[in-house]
C-alpha cells in the first residue's frame, strides 16, 4: 500500500471517528494538513467506496467474519486426509503389482 493510500485510509478513519461524513474534499484537506501529497483520484475512490457505510460498524464486524469462515476451512481440511489415504492405497496396490512381475527367476539376466 502506498503512502497516499495509507494517508487516505487514516483520514477516513479520523472522519468516521469524529462522526463526520466522508467526502473526497474532507479526505484531501486532512491529508494536506498532514503534509501528505495525495492524488485526488484516491480521495474520490475512498469516498465513493465508503459512501453510506458506517466505517465503525465495518471495523467491528471484521472479527466476526473470520470466525464464521473457520468451520468451513476445518471441513475442507477433514477431506484432505481421506484423499491422502486413498492415494496411499493406490500406490501400495501399484507396488504389489510391480513386485509380482519380478519373481526372481532371472532366466535372461
UniProtKB/Swiss-Prot annotation:
Q: Spans of biased composition, class Low complexity?
A: 68-83
Q: Cite the InterPro entries for this sequence.
A: P1/P2_N_sf (IPR038716), Ribosomal_P1/P2 (IPR027534)
Cysteines engaged in disulfide bonds, as pairs: none
Q: Which GO terms describe its molecular function?
A: protein kinase activator activity; ribonucleoprotein complex binding; structural constituent of ribosome
Q: What GO biological process, any one, is recorded here? A: cytoplasmic translational elongation
Q: How does it assemble?
A: Component of the large ribosomal subunit (LSU). Mature yeast ribosomes consist of a small (40S) and a large (60S) subunit. The 40S small subunit contains 1 molecule of ribosomal RNA (18S rRNA) and at least 33 different proteins. The large 60S subunit contains 3 rRNA molecules (25S, 5.8S and 5S rRNA) and at least 46 different proteins. The acidic ribosomal P-proteins form the stalk structure of the 60S subunit. They are organized as a pentameric complex in which uL10/P0 interacts with 2 heterodimers of P1 and P2 proteins.
* Protein name, UniProt field: Large ribosomal subunit protein P1C
Q: Whose protein is this, by species?
A: Schizosaccharomyces pombe (strain 972 / ATCC 24843) (Fission yeast)
Amino acid at each position: 500500500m502506498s503512502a497516499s493510500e495509507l494517508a487516505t485510509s487514516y483520514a477516513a478513519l479520523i472522519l468516521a471517528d469524529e462522526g463526520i461524513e466522508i467526502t473526497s474534499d474532507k479526505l484531501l484537506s486532512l491529508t494536506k494538513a498532514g503534509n501528505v501529497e495525495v492524488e485526488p483520484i484516491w480521495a474520490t475512490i475512498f469516498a465513493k467506496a465508503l459512501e453510506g457505510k458506517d466505517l465503525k460498524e465495518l471495523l467491528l464486524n471484521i472479527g466476526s467474519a473470520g470466525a464464521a469462515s473457520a468451520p468451513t476451512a476445518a471441513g475442507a481440511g477433514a477431506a484432505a486426509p481421506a484423499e491422502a489415504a486413498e492415494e496411499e492405497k493406490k500406490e501400495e496396490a501399484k507396488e504389489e503389482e510391480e513386485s509380482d512381475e519380478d519373481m526372481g527367476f532371472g532366466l535372461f539376466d
